[in-house]
């Protein structure tokens, strides 16, 4: 069969380029260390530096209890989409909580809860490109950072609006594109914290451009909510921004430890999304127990315990940054300084990045080797992510293991 032959050839090409992805199976709750297996091997305990559980909340007893109680109260499933009969009071409470949280930064804010961050980003970009029923191909232009998350890129593509990609955080290039645009509506789309580099978008400058050129600013704060800003309120709080032009996407699958996402914007923006966001309209609502757990996670994030966890994470970032800078200089890698939990070290080609990741996993440490197309060709990297759940000893163990792996694989440079 020709299709299967084509698939086999495509998979062979993926293997030849060292780009095959392999799933691992976890046998224990998400934590700093998990019991994990890879295909063909028995499960074993692995110390993880590759997840997004930045505050160590994924298995927090209070959140497990909140989900259990919510499920007991409202049942397992929602039974329908939000616009039919699946919109629970648990969903409504969470939306009100997010609207209040970001309402300090977005006047007349309302919020809309989605099953995943990916679905939220598909919705906000594609639906806002058709705001008010305009023809997106003729009356809206999307301005997208070159390193935006795949979900923002896909949302732009689905919108059928023209897309102008500007070099990563290049404000001059973006301004030139905005100045040349004659579109009725303009959408500037950006990650708040970039998922592969760990840098924070220059949101004050982006908002200034949005105001100057009558554009809207869509911010995906997947990696900022919970860890940045006052009481972990996110990247808008981090910068102290305030504008009706901001549309905010907060994701609950990272620092909040759960799943789902909420879009926060002016009440008319949210009402439009209810009417036109296909990934909201045409899917079963998230189980209400998850909404209950996420609301409890937001409580915990804003609490004294949340402050303590953020402080611990910040200490880990400072200690690890010193190790990473030293190791990168020793082995000829590129250290990418980041003030966030995302701490990438660029190795370059795919094969050595995979070899380093394999050597670390052999020693019981899991770090993802990120390769194209997730990152540009020639920038394969170890994407190290830190968590408040890690201990000081974990950070030292990682530094020692990475140094040993680098020395064994690159003895000439290590001399």
UniProtKB/Swiss-Prot annotation:
Cofactor or coenzyme needed: pyridoxal 5'-phosphate
EC number(s) reported in the record: 2.3.1.47
Record keyword Transferase present: yes
One BP term from GO: biotin biosynthetic process
Keywords recorded for this protein, A-Z: Biotin biosynthesis, Pyridoxal phosphate, Transferase
Annotated transmembrane regions: none
Residues that hold pyridoxal 5'-phosphate according to the record: 117-118, 195, 223, 251
Superkingdom classification of source: Bacteria
Catalytic activity: 6-carboxyhexanoyl-[ACP] + L-alanine + H(+) = (8S)-8-amino-7-oxononanoate + holo-[ACP] + CO2
Coiled coil: none
UniProt keyword annotation of Transferase present: yes
Pathway note: Cofactor biosynthesis; biotin biosynthesis
Entry binding sites for substrate: 21, 149, 374
GO molecular function: 8-amino-7-oxononanoate synthase activity; pyridoxal phosphate binding
A Pfam family recorded for this sequence: Aminotran_1_2
Sites of N6-(pyridoxal phosphate)lysine modification: 254
Signal peptide positions (record): none
Function: Catalyzes the decarboxylative condensation of pimeloyl-[acyl-carrier protein] and L-alanine to produce 8-amino-7-oxononanoate (AON), [acyl-carrier protein], and carbon dioxide.
Family: Belongs to the class-II pyridoxal-phosphate-dependent aminotransferase family. BioF subfamily.
Subunit structure as annotated in this protein's UniProt entry: Homodimer.
NCBIfam families (UniProt xref): bioF
Protein name, entry field: 8-amino-7-oxononanoate synthase
Native organism: Ralstonia pickettii (strain 12J)
